[in-house]
Amino acid sequence: MLRKNDTPGKLIIVEGIDGSGKSTQIDLLHKWLRAQGHSVYFSEWNSSGLVKSTTKTAKKRKLFTPTTFSLLQCTDFADRWENQILPLLKAGVVVLADRYAFTAFGRDVARGVDRQWVRNLYSFALQPDVALFFRVPLDIAVQRITSARASLKYYEAGMDLNLSESRTESFEIFQGRILNEYDSMVNEFGLTVIDGTLTVQAQQRLVRDIIKQELKGWKGLPIPEGSPQILLQSES
């Protein structure tokens, strides 16, 4: 288990396989929270400027092994954690994260990395106050992704694992492995499951109800009265 969040801030994260619709939901939540007067910071997976060029080069040249990929992704997370996420939590800000350590727990293990080793790697992270897992059946997620993109990227499709010569088939197998890991994390880390097949509006109503309950009676860092609502987000 991750350590409990003992900072004045609130950490709210979303997870799900590719095509789950989680990014749409956290974007809507972000805008709603700001409209409610909360200071909100948004961070997304694989967005640290520290390792961006290295990651891009390694992907282009197909240099990653499962272990080196895991370590570099953790470096990205640690950089954002220490320089952005944790300081803002300590300041009483609502931090929203599109993917968190659970993404590594899913993807890295799906690539064959030891489950406990990956969890130990992220032991510095805090347990989110709210962790939403947008669950969709594998076939729906695959259909959403393949219909929205001209082609699947090499690592996104799990082509490094030699699961299939077909990128679409490899993607489906790889995402299936990740989905199995997510399902096993629901009880382990207290993930709240949201039905990703519901309408966008219905999902957002559920999300807001959960967040309202979490923030009930909580006094975080408000946006100063009379000042513009500055959008806080990570560099990408």
Listing of model-derived features with the role each one plays in the protein:
Residues 14:
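Hydrophobic anchor at the beta1->P-loop junction of P-loop NTPases
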Residues 47-49, 101-102, 136-142, 199-200:
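Conserved nucleotide-binding/hydrolysis micro-motifs of P-loop NTPases
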Residues 32, 36-126:
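ATP-dependent small-molecule kinase phosphotransfer cores
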Residues 1-5, 30, 146-236:
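NTP-dependent small-molecule kinase module
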Residues 17:
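P-loop (Walker A) phosphate-binding loop of NTP-binding proteins
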Residues 25:
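Hydrophobic positions on the alpha1 helix immediately C-terminal to the Walker A/P-loop
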Residues 104-177:
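A glycine- and Lys/Arg-enriched "phosphate-lid" helix/loop adjacent to the NTP-binding pocket
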Residues 22:
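Conserved lysine of the Walker
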